[in-house]
Amino acid sequence: MESKDASTSATSIDQLCKTFNLSLHTLQIQCVFCRNALTTAEIYAYAYKNLKVVWRDNFPFAACACCLELQGKINQYRHFNYAAYAPTVEEETNEDILKVLIRCYLCHKPLCEIEKLKHILGKARFIKLNNQWKGRCLHCWTTCMEDLLP
């Protein structure tokens, strides 16, 4: 699945499938980090999270779940700006917190309203990584909290 012009090629899994007349189920794509093939479940998750396709040497790549989480951890250590509560995020972005695109810092899923409200009601901070606001989705929140349980 080589593209003649990577600069104008698909930027999402959905666009990639439309461009090359493929279904999500038949798409085969490698991880940009480890070069392993993504599973069908990982491809669906990547599309659901609306993550971008990366082009290298005119070939598309995505990221497997393991590498996404690893990159999330690396970003936390390398690109941490600061942590803040919702009012600070709203003040900085000049938008209501529910309208701000905030992704999970581990799995990179965009947070839904409920996940943002969980941060607010639980008095949890959002973190700014590489000048982008991040938080925790419900799945990663429970995974993180399991480590704290006896």
Swiss-Prot record:
Pfam families: E6. GO terms for molecular function: DNA binding; zinc ion binding. It is found in: Host cytoplasm; Host nucleus. The keyword rRNA processing does not apply. A zinc finger (unnamed) spans 31-67, 104-140. HAMAP family: HPV_E6 (MF_04006). Belongs to the papillomaviridae E6 protein family. This is Protein E6. It comes from Human papillomavirus 11. The gene is E6.
